[in-house]
Amino acid sequence: MLYARDNDHRWGQEGNRVVNVVMLLLSLALPLIHLAVTTGPWTRRNVLRLFLIYAFVFDVGAVGFLFGFIPHVFFADQAAELIGWPKGSMFQFEVGLHDGAWGILGFMCVFFGGGFWLATAIGWSFFMFGAAWGHIHEIIERGNYAPYNFFPAITDTLIPLYLLGLLYAYWRAGGLDGKLRPET
């Protein structure tokens, strides 16, 4: 396997290493802009709903489809090198389809809410926490500091924490279409 270490030339690809952070920042900044330029009854529940929609679109949809599916399926060898995986494995294709499926679900959250949001958030978070554990394991056990292995260990933890935290706050505010409402 190829592993990026120290001052490896690939380590300087800052744009590639921060894509998940950019998506997370967009999912935070765009709803703030949305709130600033629109009027409406901005209750706590409505604000949380808005943040959730942006989080599903950017942190699940874009990350899964644009930055998971497309690289793993159409640029598999380059993605493998950046992660520190062997080239030519069908596993890349399988991972890409998996990411693409979650990406589609993230985009669909614009049209569906309630239990669909809950299932999407829990499933995506389970995958992301598992991916974070895999990245950390690769770092500890194999010294794999390849750009696409090291940095995702952080974002694959932060994104699901943010998404689940938003969903929990939305639920507490009476969201999820009134389903699973907490006792008051």
Language-model segments: which ranges?
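Membrane-helix boundary connector in multi-pass membrane proteins
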Residues: V110-T120, W133-F150
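Membrane-helix boundary elements
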Residues: L66-G88
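Hydrophobic transmembrane alpha-helical segments in integral membrane proteins
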Residues: G12-I33
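A loop-to-helix transmembrane entry motif
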Residues: F56-G61, W85-A101
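Non-cytosolic membrane-interface motifs at loop->transmembrane helix junctions
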Residues: E81-M90, N144-T155
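Hydrophobic alpha-helical membrane segments
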Residues: H98-W102, T120-I136, L158-Y162
